[in-house]
């Protein structure tokens, strides 16, 4: 029987139905223009773009231009790629243009969909950013979809790591720019550390289309992007603390796996105190509870977390003497990404690899706050509905489920739950053998590298050929995914979220053609393609007859969305398929969330070894547990955002002020205002209002003026005059300072003085902001304890954060004023000394760039092997990543030939 809610939906339709219905008339308008645009020549398509650009840039609403722009783009894609966009793809493009998240199933052509809103919004001339999850996809999509934009007379750029600023500037100035979320965020931070407008790379934040939007805006929302510099070396402390960790007994610590946190118990603190005192780290008489012990306690906690909560091959791998993190949502290696607060160093000590120094934050931003900079934001994904509330609340984005072009024919079976992991894996192997026997391609989903490799060993014992895709095989990813739909293929993969490459039944035609032509360059491309397409059609039919792709998952993820993404790999474009989850009561999700109750139920039912329970109730129970985890994670992200918003408001104020200074030719007024405020502060501090003259601290004011303003003024004499008040002394100091600074400007020349003032302002802003970030981080780490005193940590953080910000601004004014007051022109002798040092530096740089001219003892070329040939990399030995490239390009090795290493 239908409930009242379901009955209402039947009568009135769901909000999603209404949104889809409202887009249909626009799709019809685009379809009505199709024949008209098909009749246009290639030059006419570009001419249409120029006409639409003129209308958009003269103020015409983009919504009015949509039908013509979409029709033009559809025709360009048909000519450039041989792809005609379906109505559902046009609909997805409409929702993206309107600033929504378009939920489109795997295989529905999201890459092509993005070109429609990108083209329409690029007509405004402000640039559009299409955001992908990795560099491979950014380059692939820019090259592939760039053909469509070229057909339309528009430029395409791609941004990736290690480009120089000139290349990045050019990419950002293109009409449409493809980039990863990481690179966009880092470029934003780097731009706000530049010394002039000309050095900046980005040109604003107008419109972004985020692919795999749930992965970027939700899974990575808690990870800030940080540009940092090295701090003091504490490697010995990490090693000493790490040595104690294996000695910890269960009563020494308490684990909270749900929150991924660990704390020492009372017994643990006593154990730690004794060990630290014996090792000489904790001085005699000092306890862990003393304020001086804060750093030691913090690093001991991190060492324990490294041992008890971070597992090798699940959370990280060790490669080339380095701990490389693994993204738990996508299974990808996150090279260059490091855990903060000493946790990464603790893991390095645990694994016995080189311990890299901790870093001090120079600039940071979260993805939540970076993407909220855009005037308009939209996104695409295969799974967003489960997180619709979070998208709406944090990003003000609606989620619209776009209908599939063809009905989904995949069969999603009920989960099978076993009592032990051993029973579960035995059943998994049997299911794989059964499907493999009929040639059905199988995608086996696992949650960690360790489990994927264990399954691989089990399949090898059974003699079943298979591929493994995890962070270790990251480089072969595209090839493995392309082959996963072939007849009889078995592919084991860690989380497939955000992989970006569709699994096509029968294999990927384009990749087969490329391989065939690479193997035989003399072959006729058309003949090769015709042969491969015929073979592919036969193989695809055999796969369809076998039941399509079988997605077999070995565990539920904490997030329903990740499970749905794995399921969505099967049944693309109306193909048949099947998905099935195998679980056990020993799985992490089951163990942490209520497996005991289920175990009792299974015992009551009298289940025997190897038997599974299959029931819709189990699915619902698991989904409730997952919803609980998602809700808790949402609350954590929401709370983190509230804290980050405090810093974000301050960041925006500082970056905006910095930008204004870079844009302003004449910053003398800003420096003069700061000087006036400094003088006011000095007067108020030493000659307080409503204080009698005999209560004034005249000597203190005299010394402060010498220190801050670099002038020895007769303040004692002024204070002794009859009828002199604070305002008179303030005015005299101000006049003397103005005259002193005017004299400096004359000595340097007006143009030089302008440059000096600008550089001093920017340097001091950067320096103060860096110090302020460290202070805010410290405040953030301790403010949580205020909750024990019945005070709201967030309110305390806001209040104290604002006070710290005001203190920073006061310090900024004082330091800028002091530095400008102390500068002076160089003497001739100093200028000659500087010139000599500069020439010496230049000579050293030249020698580094061309070391073949610099011979060491024994006639060997310094830094290179004997028999060196700059055109032959085999003679280069092993250059360090940061050495100049031996080819003589002048670039660092890692940015030149080292890219290929």
UniProtKB/Swiss-Prot annotation:
Cofactor needs: Zn(2+)
EC number per UniProt: 7.4.2.8
Co-factor: note: May bind 1 zinc ion per subunit.
SMART domains assigned: SecA_DEAD, SecA_PP_bind
Binding site for ATP: 89, 107-111, 502
Compartment(s): Cell inner membrane; Cytoplasm
Entry-linked PROSITE patterns: SECA (PS01312), SECA_MOTOR_DEAD (PS51196)
Predominant location: membrane
Chain intervals for the UniProt region annotation (Disordered): 838-883
Protein known as: Protein translocase subunit SecA
């Amino acid at each position: 029987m239908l409930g009242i809610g379901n009955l209402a939906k039947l009568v009135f339709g769901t909000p999603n139905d209404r949104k889809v219905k409202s887009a249909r008339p626009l799709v019809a308008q685009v379809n009505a223009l199709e024949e008209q645009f098909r009749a246009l020549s290639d030059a006419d398509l570009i001419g249409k773009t120029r006409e639409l650009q003129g209308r958009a840039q003269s103020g015409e609403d983009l919504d009015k231009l949509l039908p013509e722009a979409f029709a033009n783009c559809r025709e360009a894609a048909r000519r450039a790629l041989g792809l005609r966009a379906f109505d559902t793809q046009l609909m997805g493009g409409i929702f993206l243009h309107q600033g929504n998240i378009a939920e489109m199933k795997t295989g529905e052509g999201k890459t092509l969909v993005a070109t429609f809103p990108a083209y329409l919004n690029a007509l405004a001339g402000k640039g559009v950013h299409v955001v992908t999850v990795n560099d491979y996809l950014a380059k692939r999509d820019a090259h592939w979809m760039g053909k469509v934009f070229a057909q339309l007379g528009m430029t395409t750029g791609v941004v990736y790591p290690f480009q120089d600023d000139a290349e990045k500037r050019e990419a950002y100035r293109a009409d449409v720019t493809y980039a990863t979320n990481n690179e966009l965020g880092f470029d934003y931070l780097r731009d706000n550390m530049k010394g002039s407008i000309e050095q900046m790379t980005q040109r604003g934040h107008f419109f972004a289309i985020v692919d795999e939007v749930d992965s970027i805006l939700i899974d990575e929302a808690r990870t800030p992007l940080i540009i940092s510099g090295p701090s003091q070396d504490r490697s010995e402390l990490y090693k000493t603390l790490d040595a104690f960790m294996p000695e910890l007994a269960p009563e020494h610590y308490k684990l909270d796996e749900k929150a991924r946190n660990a704390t020492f118990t009372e017994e643990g603190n006593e154990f730690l105190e004794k060990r630290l005192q014996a090792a000489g780290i904790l001085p005699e008489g000092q306890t862990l509870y003393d304020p001086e012990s804060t750093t030691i306690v913090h690093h001991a906690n991190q060492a324990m977390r490294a041992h008890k909560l971070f597992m090798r091959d699940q959370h990280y791998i060790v490669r080339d003497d380095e701990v490389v993190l693994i993204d738990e949502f996508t299974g990808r290696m996150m090279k260059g990404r490091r855990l903060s607060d000493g946790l990464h160093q603790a893991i390095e000590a645990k694994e016995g690899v080189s311990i890299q120094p901790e870093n001090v934050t120079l600039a940071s931003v979260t993805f939540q706050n970076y993407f909220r900079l855009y005037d308009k934001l939209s996104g695409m994904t295969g799974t967003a509905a489960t997180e619709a509330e979070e998208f709406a609340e944090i990003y003000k984005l609606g989620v619209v489920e776009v209908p599939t072009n063809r009905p989904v024919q995949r069969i999603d079976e009920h989960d099978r739950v076993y009592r032990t992991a051993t029973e579960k894996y035995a059943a998994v192997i049997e299911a794989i053998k059964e499907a493999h026997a009929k040639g059905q391609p199988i995608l086996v989903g696992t949650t960690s590298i360790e489990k994927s490799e264990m399954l691989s060993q089990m399949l090898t014992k059974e003699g079943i050929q298979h591929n493994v895709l995890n962070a270790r095989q990251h480089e072969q990813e595209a090839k493995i995914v392309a082959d996963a739909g072939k007849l009889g293929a078995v592919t084991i993969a860690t989380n497939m979220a955000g992989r970006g490459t569709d699994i096509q039944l029968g294999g990927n035609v384009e990749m087969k053609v490329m391989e065939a032509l690479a193997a035989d360059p003399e072959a006729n491309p058309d003949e090769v393609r015709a042969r491969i397409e015929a073979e592919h059609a036969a193989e695809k039919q055999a796969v369809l007859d076998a039941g399509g792709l079988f997605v077999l998952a070995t565990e539920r993820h904490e997030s329903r969305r990740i499970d749905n993404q794995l399921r969505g790999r099967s049944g693309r474009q109306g193909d048949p398929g099947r998905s099935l989850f195998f679980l056990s009561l020993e799985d992490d999700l089951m163990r942490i969330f209520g497996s005991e109750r289920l175990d009792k139920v299974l015992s009551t039912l009298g289940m025997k070894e190897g038997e599974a329970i299959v029931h819709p109730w189990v699915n619902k129970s698991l989904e409730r547990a997952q919803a609980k985890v998602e809700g808790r994670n949402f609350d954590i992200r929401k709370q983190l955002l509230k804290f980050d918003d405090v810093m974000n408001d301050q960041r925006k104020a500082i970056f905006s002020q910095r930008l204004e200074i870079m844009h302003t030719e004449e910053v003398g007024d800003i420096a003069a205002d700061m000087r006036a405020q400094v003088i006011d502060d000095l007067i108020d501090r030493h000659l307080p209002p409503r204080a009698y003259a005999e209560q004034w601290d005249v000597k203190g004011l005299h010394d402060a003026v010498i220190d801050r303003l670099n002038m020895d003024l007769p303040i004692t004499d002024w204070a002794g005059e009859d009828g002199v008040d604070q305002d008179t002394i303030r005015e005299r100091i101000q006049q003397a300072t103005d005259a002193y600074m005017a004299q400096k400007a004359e000595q340097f020349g007006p143009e030089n003085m302008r440059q000096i003032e600008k550089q001093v302002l920017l340097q001091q802003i950067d320096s103060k902001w860096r110090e302020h970030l460290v202070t805010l981080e410290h405040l953030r780490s301790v403010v949580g304890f205020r909750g024990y005193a019945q005070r709201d940590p967030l309110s305390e953080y806001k209040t104290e954060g604002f006070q710290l910000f005001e203190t920073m601004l006061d310090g900024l004014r004082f330091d800028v004023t002091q530095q400008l007051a102390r500068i002076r022109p160089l003497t001739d002798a100093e200028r000659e000394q500087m010139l000599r040092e500069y020439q010496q530096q230049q000579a050293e740089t030249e020698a580094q760039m061309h070391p073949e001219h610099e011979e060491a003892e024994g006639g060997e070329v310094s830094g290179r092997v004997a028999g060196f040939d700059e055109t032959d990399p085999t003679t280069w030995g092993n250059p360090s990543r940061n050495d100049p490239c031996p080819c003589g390009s002048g670039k660092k090795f890692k940015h030149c030939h080292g890219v290929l290493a």
